[in-house]
């Protein structure tokens, strides 16, 4: 009953041809199939046995061991003390080599099949080094050692940003993420485990941290993120086959949503972006892989974010999408849209962003907003259509431009739901006689304001 994604990387190697290791799904009706195996290892976390299964296991007469058990009734073991210690050591040290050695040990010592079999090698003690790259062998005790190796192998880019991945050791989906970030011209270091977070900040001083969370960080970690002004990106690892995830309209639910999105946001985590899901490998086992189109988008977002830390505010470009306007619309009445936007613009100007001259009052800004609404086609601005406001511009988008954006941002089947509801580009609301799309914007230097369109009925 081990999760397949834990076994998949361990079994992705050449194993003893005399041994067959089979992952079995464990349900309330499981049990009889265990009679076909010579050794049974259960993953104890969350494991349950029905009364019938308990009776079957008690009479099975097979070597049986339950790891990581959280309940007394599932903490079963029929091995000798020595056998249990050895298998626990193989599993505890982890890695492909120890998994292969454990299978040889089970066949030789537990099952007693010794004919033409070499004596199995003992568990290999694996040191847990804090800093690592892709391979299990590329792990280092200090960041200085890692950096020396990183430079020696030609990966280091002078004056480039450094991204730290907080994760467990090993490759898999992590290998693809490291490769994608390095292709963007970034330096990458992986830190093994949350226990290493505090000293890692002091020695690495990363420009951005990527962490696939399950719960909250400690208060000290949050303080360090603030102290060094380090963005924390928290992409999501979906524990479902990718096809199932796409078909499930609920997305993430319950505890997984809370632990992977809500709790990390309390620590300042951003970008809850689905980055990886489960796929079948060539052995038929489910393993985590990054979703190809999403990997590229995420890596580009990381690059742009690190670039922003180095770029002067005067060169940064910002789009503000606002909802509604002052006045008659019930949905936005009393929200102070113009006042809020003007306060933001003044704050940006004070921080050195290029805004050009700003309106003196919220009322002046609202005139421009209503004129923009008219250009944008929302009913709030219909009465302002005759006003001429220099900063209000109509931007034309061609079919080629639009479809290039769509192809880059959403799957084809998802876009079909858009066209089924609103028709083909450019739709009804923003169509020009030439078949392009025209939308309105208000420009203040490097900052533009765009109104989010309301629902449009057939009329």
Give residue ranges: language-model regions.
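An N-terminal assembly and electron-transfer interface module characteristic of large anaerobic redox
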Residues: 1-459
